[in-house]
Amino acid sequence: MANFYTDNPSLKVHLTHPMMKKIVELKERDFADADKFDYAPQNFDDAMDSYDKVLEIVGEICGDIIAENAEDVDHNGPRVENGRVVYAEGTKKNLDACRKAGLMGMSMPRRLGGLNFPITPYIMAADIVSRADAGFENLWGLQDCAETIYEFASDEQKEKYIPRVCAGETMSMDLTEPDAGSDLQSVMLKASQKEDGSWVVNGVKRFITNGDSDIHLVLARSEEGSKDGRGLSMFIYDKRNGGVTVRRIENKMGIKGSPTCELVYKDAPVELVGSRRMGLIKYVMALMNGARLGIAAQSVGLSEAAYREALAYAKDRRQFGKAIIDFPAVAEILSLMKAKLDASRTLLYACSRFVDMYKIYDDIAKERKLEPEEKAEQK
């Protein structure tokens, strides 16, 4: 049985970095959850053992299920039926395995149904999933949209939506439009407030990854007459309420298991997140900063898969009576690939640890005033 965690010793090297002790102790608030949840760690060693065991489960699922389904998923892909996305059979099996293993909402607090993982081991899981199937990582990795709900939504919204994500419901970030790709301040999806104070949105979004998800974060124009980013707000759309249909799925060159959708909104009911006008300049910026780590993990995971494929081929392919890996030119290519892979992974986890420190202190600051040395560490 393949295990994409245990067969890659470099992952454990990064998991046991000395900085993790500080991160874990802060994240666990000196292990205050130990008396409240039977699966909460008692101390640092217990926490690290928990991360290690969960990553072993991720590695096993990736090696035995997700990687085995990857070719079929990429060949068949999802389809649209009656305005809804139907995942490929392999994708359904992948999601089912992750749900049963409790691998959704990994970084969310235990009180909301999550595992309370720091960002670093969560990104490590994303690295492993990406090696198995980068397309599935696009779906599974969107669970980190819950971070935005946790950071900026009301307590009522947190309690309403985050437990659903932790239970296995999927998410998407509905940002781009036909005339607003990289230039998000040009977004024109219209958000209208009704007399009773509720909101509805109307318009079209395009290139939305996993666009038929259960819970959407939607960027829309809430301020009549505005034309720039200061007129945009963020909303939550719940698929259960209806009002959004999938017009089509884009025919991409790769990662076809991930449905990239065009969405049509017709009086779709939504909930405002945080404050009006802050959708792009604050909430989306925070959302995309987290997404960048996920995409970096996806790139590293893909690089790992490519390197292993190249190495296996070089050992198997024979010319002039010997394996081509024995030719200095080929060996040099492989050595350079490995060096770049190791450097990329090192940079990824160094960044993840700093993000952990920033986010944890940001969360602590909601509970109490940070000490001067803590503010310095956060920076």
Regions found by a protein language model. Name each.
Residues 1-136, 156, 160, 360-377:
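Amphipathic, small/basic residue-rich leader segments at the start of a protein or domain
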Residues 36-39, 240-243, 247, 259-291, ...:
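A glycine-rich, basic-preceded beta-loop-alpha segment at the flavin cofactor/substrate interface
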Residues 81-108, 172-196, 200, 206-215, ...:
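Flexible, glycine/threonine-enriched loop-and-boundary segments that flank and lead into catalytic domains
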Residues 198, 202-244:
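A short core secondary-structure module
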